[in-house]
């Protein structure tokens, strides 16, 4: 089963190019260790929420931009092996020392794929990213499976839902803190891939107007008031 490491980072806006280059160097190491794909999304349409949002998640300052990213592996065993190899690589120590962002505020975790429909495309131009506090896994999968068809009917090329598996509470920032996670809830890391921002804007309008999205399921399996979401322009992808 495909496994994902998910990340959210606050990057100084004027270090955008440095971050892209840094991600490329990181991918070279990750790919050699067994990762199959990496994608980095630069914050473009990231709203400030009332309770939670991506800015709060990483304590982003006014001079920083939120990045939403992930790395894919064939399975959890491959991910664990890659992590061990990377941590022992001298190049990784150099890369960590040169990070163009505050690593102490980066949030990250490991996730099992629940839903993965469509196909990853080398020309993905835009990403909608989501973090959700989910209480009922089975009900969430059923709801997400219905919804993914609507997104793809309106132009999305891929829809992924991933269930928190190796997600630490963190000391400064973390996925659980970002969602004000409660007992019995699990973090879901999710994204929708689009060919471009124009396709995303048109597609999301279609999704919102689609009759299939007008009737929510009885007993939503997550708290929508604490859901975190935003739109990201693709900055780097392997």
Cite the ranges covered by each PLM segment.
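Glycine-rich beta-strand-turn "strand-cap" elements at beta-sheet edges
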Residues: 31, 37-62, 88-124, 152, ...
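Short amphipathic alpha-helices in soluble, non-transmembrane regions
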Residues: 20-26, 82-90, 142-147, 203-211
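Short loop/beta submotifs within extracellular cysteine-rich repeat domains
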Residues: 15-17, 76-79, 92-93, 137-140, ...
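Generic detector of contiguous secondary-structure segments
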Residues: 18-31, 66-68, 139-152, 187-191
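A residue-identity detector for tryptophan
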Residues: 27, 42, 70, 163, ...
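Surface-exposed interaction/gating patches
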Residues: 8-10, 120-158
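Short, well-ordered beta-strand segments in beta-rich or mixed alpha/beta enzyme
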Residues: 4-11, 50-85, 126-134, 171-207
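Hydrophobic, helix-prone linear segments
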Residues: 1-27, 31-33
